[in-house]
Regions:
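Long, position-biased, composition-driven segments near the start of the mature protein
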Residues: 1-295
């Protein structure tokens, strides 16, 4: 009896950028930044600086958009459907800041530590400081190996533990499984393993209110504070000199060599979640490896 994947409302796309970076980190090769592959180029921010190839970037940033969905009206009740990204995409469907502040009400130095891609923009004849990139706290993230058993449509997940059988493998016939056949969501019963990490992205009340303020400025009302695409990005922090509304200068960290590693298409309206939101995204191995029957 086959098991069926449960659709959780999100679509995840691993990018070519992610595979290139992974290969560089595995082999010790220089990290490459092909032209038109960075979020710096998409947002036209910090494009003059590129990290040295020997610098080791890691996932630690995110940006958002509001065009990662369509409305399906083929039924009586309209459905909001996420739109997947191509693995060779390097920008966003839309350009939406996470924060917009009037010139006389910029983020504090402490608040600014959580953001990057700071730029001055004019919206409706008024000037604002816009922030398009948010740093993700990766300190609690750890990799996990999962041992997954599906039997009669019921899935059991536990930590994978290496044994003497893995340390001293013997030749045997491996199960035949076509990983390239993605034409069906039916997953056969059996045993699988995967390695990855659960990345929790919390949206605090501060984050939600800032994004609702962005929507109110851009659209005249915060009612449709929609996020329907998230890019999880790698990059490198670099010191930068900013200027306040009064012309005084200050130092803060910007981000260069920012590349999308994962795109998440979803649909959420922060005006409805109101004060907070938490997303858990599994990153790492795109699909589990089939080991054969559960016995």
């Amino acid at each position: 009896m086959a098991n069926t994947k449960v659709y959780d409302g999100k679509l995840s796309t691993v990018t070519l950028n992610a595979m290139r970076l992974t290969t560089a980190l595995l082999t010790g090769a220089d990290v490459q930044y092909p032209q038109k592959s960075t979020m710096n180029e998409f947002y036209k921010l910090m494009t003059a600086k590129v990290p040295d190839g020997a610098t080791r970037p890691h996932l630690g940033y995110m940006c958002v958009g509001n065009r990662g969905h369509i409305v399906d009206q083929s039924d009586v009740v309209a459905d909001v459907v996420p739109v997947a990204k191509s693995p060779i995409a390097s920008g966003m469907f839309s350009r939406v800041p996470l924060v917009l502040r009037t010139l006389d009400n910029d983020l504090s130095d402490e608040q600014r530590k959580q953001y990057a891609f700071r730029t001055r923009e004019t919206i409706g004849a008024r000037d604002y400081w816009a922030y398009y990139l948010k740093r993700i706290d990766m300190r609690a993230v750890k990799t996990t190996d999962l041992d997954i058993t599906r039997e009669n449509g019921i899935e059991t997940v536990k930590d994978f533990v290496y044994t003497d059988a893995e340390l001293n493998p013997v030749p045997k016939e491996l199960p035949d499984y076509d990983y390239d056949d993605d034409s069906t969501v039916e997953i056969p019963d059996g045993r699988y393993v995967e390695s990855g990490a659960d990345l929790v992205i919390p949206w605090t009340e501060f984050d939600v209110q800032e994004y609702m303020n962005v929507t109110a400025i851009l659209r005249g009302t915060p009612r449709s504070s929609i996020i329907s695409e998230i890019a999880l990005c790698s990059g490198v922090d670099t010191p930068e000199t900013g200027e306040s509304a009064t012309g005084s200068q200050f130092s803060y960290n910007e981000a260069i060599g920012v590349q999308a590693l994962y795109y998440i298409s979803l649909f959420t309206n922060l005006a409805q979640t109101n004060d907070r939101l938490s997303l858990t995204i599994r990153i790492g191995q795109p699909a589990p490896w089939f080991l054969g029957t559960a016995n």
